[in-house]
Design a protein with these regions (language model features):
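An N-terminal assembly and electron-transfer interface module characteristic of large anaerobic redox
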Residues: 1-143
Length: 143
């Protein structure tokens, strides 16, 4: 994990000024055991299938990634120069642990792996993404 002190001063100051939400209470829920859960990955790494339109600055949409997608069919088009791709280039599971998720399902540690996963472009304003997220939530609930 990146440490704040490793960033240049300008970026460090910018990050320290970002607003962070505060919550007065914790929502009540009864978690379902992981062995009964169907799990999907949601990433902000700008991943997509080869042949899909690459992400651009400010894109608020997402790209669906089928469960059986081999690592060599995924491309990262994240636009940030500050986004470290080193781990991704060595092992996709660092950024998008689909193989590990399938291992967990095979070992019975989670119920199953969703048919589709998704990736967004990171650093997009949340307000721009709202309609996309509502649509995606519907797709994920059906799965």
């Amino acid at each position: 994990m990146a440490r704040l002190e490793n960033y240049p001063e300008a970026i460090r100051n910018h990050l320290l000024k970002l607003p962070c939400p505060t919550f007065d209470s914790t929502p009540f829920n009864r978690p379902i055991p992981m062995k009964e859960q169907r799990v999907a990955l949601v990433s902000t790494a700008g991943l997509h299938l080869r042949g899909d339109r690459p992400f651009r600055l400010g894109d608020a949409d997402h790209r669906l990634i089928p469960r059986d997608t081999p690592a060599n069919r995924l491309v990262m088009s994240h636009i940030s120069t500050n986004f470290d791709r080193t781990g991704y280039l060595q092992d996709l599971n660092v950024v998008f642990p689909l193989e590990r998720l399938n291992d967990l399902a095979r070992n019975g540690e989670i119920g199953s792996v969703a048919e589709y996963h998704t990736s967004f472009m990171g650093a997009t304003e949340p307000e721009k993404m709202e309609s996309t997220v509502v649509e995606l939530a519907s797709v994920m609930k059906k799965d």
